[in-house]
């Protein structure tokens, strides 16, 4: 998703203090997201000569929202074949290939996704989450519990007042969300529930540095 990729690149720059220009609607600037500290917490750093457990790496990448595939073609995908790991970080322009020697990282190089030809060797690879929300099983369970607890009185009220269609719709939406989250499948719109899964949320405005310049176009529409 191109929009997700651009948003994650902006968040990466804000988290690392890199300069960036953001063009967005007022609503988008005030949308809730997890605090940037969560993003920093889940970053994966891999460097040459580092010991690396591939099973552990696979689990971490899945938790970060990356999709395991047979071959890497798009951002947000990774593949493991023997002692070779290909990954296309969401915030990078090209994929990376990690060659292992036993349990140690031998080389890290960028490569072209179409031709599979190597571009250049690098010493380190930094992998950021593939989405704004990193949802472990524990966080999913807590979030679903909070959501169900909040909606339970409302759902009961609908049921008691014989608003059966509205009641069935709410129950269905919760069941679908729960099923998708449990299966760790791609979920669109889950960011609408961010407050249920994270106790510490912010907006993009909160993440801007103190010396940031803010320009508002068409101020009449803002008010």
PLM region spans:
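ASCE RecA-like P-loop NTPase motor cores
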Residues: 1-223
């Amino acid at each position: 998703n191109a929009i997700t990729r651009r948003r994650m690149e902006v968040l990466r720059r804000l988290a690392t203090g890199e300069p960036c220009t953001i063009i967005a609607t007022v609503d988008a600037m005030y949308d809730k997201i997890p605090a940037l500290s969560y993003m920093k917490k889940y970053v994966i750093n891999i460097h040459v000569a580092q010991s690396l457990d591939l099973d552990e790496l696979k689990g971490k990448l899945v938790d970060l929202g990356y999709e395991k595939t047979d071959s890497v073609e798009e951002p947000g995908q990774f593949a493991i074949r023997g002692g070779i790991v290909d990954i296309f970080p969401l915030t990078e322009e090209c994929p990376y290939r990690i060659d292992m020697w036993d349990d140690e990282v031998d080389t890290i190089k960028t490569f072209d996704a179409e031709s599979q030809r190597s571009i250049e060797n690098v010493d380190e690879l930094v992998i950021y989450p593939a989405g704004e929300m990193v949802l472990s099983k524990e966080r999913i369970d807590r979030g679903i519990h909070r959501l169900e607890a909040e909606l339970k009185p409302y759902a009961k009220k609908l049921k008691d007042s014989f608003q059966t269609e509205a009641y069935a719709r709410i129950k269905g939406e919760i069941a679908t969300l729960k099923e998708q989250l449990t299966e760790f499948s791609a979920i669109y719109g889950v960011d609408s529930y961010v407050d249920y899964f994270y106790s510490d949320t912010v907006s993009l405005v909160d993440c801007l540095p103190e010396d940031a310049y803010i320009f508002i176009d068409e101020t009449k529409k803002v008010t």
